[in-house]
Amino acid sequence: MISGFATPKGTETFKQNSSVNSLNFNDFENLHLSNVGIGTYLGEPDTRTDELVKNAVKQSVLSGVNVIDTAINYRAQKAERSVGKAISELIEDGKISRDQIFVSSKNGYVTNDADIQEDFMQYVMRELGKPGIVKEGDITSGYHCMTTSFLSDQLDRSLKNLDLECLDLMYLHNSIEGQIKDVSKEQFLENLKSVFELYEQKRDEGKIKFYGMATWECFRVMNDNSQFLLLEDIVEMAKNVGGENHGFKFIQLPYNMNYDQALLGKNQLIQNKPVSILESAVTLGIGVFTSVPFMQGRLLSPGVMPDFNDLKPSLRALQFIRSSPGVLAPLVGQKLSEHVSENLEIMNIPPMSNEDFLQLVKKLTS
């Protein structure tokens, strides 16, 4: 397995060695992270897609992207394995070292293994039920599980799939979204604290550097929604568990020119003052990665997005997201080489200044 993790020196070397505009890196937790990342969500669980994802990750890294995002349930574990192969080949070829890239994955959804031809429930019973990793009642109706025994097992599987000794960031995946139909909010928060305790332990063991929450609804909806979470409360929980140097430093949420709640919705509170989730994250020192930049292609249709900056739709979408104050990087799902090339043209131009971005938002919302 590949040892190491992203470091300030390694990521700075990556930034210096890349041919992209130097403004296209954000400094967070002393790491230099590209302001576009590659995501690996979609695709068939077959060998052709394995090759496409592996090559897309390699092409992205060689084009100046050092943020790579995946999840154990993406393509039933094959996404993680494709990422792992890409990283191994890049390191073997001397193109990068482990300390130059930031790799995140997600655990929480129960998944099978696409490389094993077996019925889903048979696999779950054999791999998780019989060994006692999960017991009756642990898995919700949404095929989600956040017991510490399950998440500990899944982290080890993710590390094995990725061929990494240490993961830079492990997200708890859609936790309240996957749990709230079956457990009370109070019970959920108790369980979340146990997960944070587990992840602090895994930091001590050297298996992860940071942990976070990859979400869909909870940080975008209003506080009367059962899925709503106040980021200030979650950070306070992390401090209670891990002290001031706790590892809860990142969230992920959907954000684009259609899903604009992260920017415009004042659903969060900081010292009782209404703020957006992006404003809250900045104040609390939480890094934000964003998903679905193109709404899985729907935003790229002619006439869907407003015109600005004379950029093609895909670049316009990325420019808007990565220029938003508080966003570290949109995560772009891309497999075909021509899509990678087109999307990463954005790395040749700097993000918008805060002033220009705020003027654009004013224009678009007036």
What are these regions (language model features)?
Residues 52-56, 154-157, 317:
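Well-ordered alpha-helical segments embedded in enzymatic catalytic cores
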Residues 93-94, 139, 269, 287:
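Short helix-coil transition/hinge motifs at the ends and kinks of transmembrane helices
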Residues 35, 67, 166-169, 210, ...:
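Residues at the N-termini of beta-strands
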Residues 1-126, 133, 165, 183-186, ...:
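N-terminal binding-site loop/beta-alpha segment at the start of enzyme catalytic domains
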Residues 113-171, 177:
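Active-site gating/metal-coordination segments in enzymes
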Residues 39-52, 136-152, 181-186, 304-311:
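Active-site mouth loops of central-metabolism enzymes
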Residues 2-24, 149, 156, 173-366:
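Beta/alpha (TIM)-barrel catalytic core signal, keyed to glycine-rich beta->alpha loops juxtaposed to Asp/Glu
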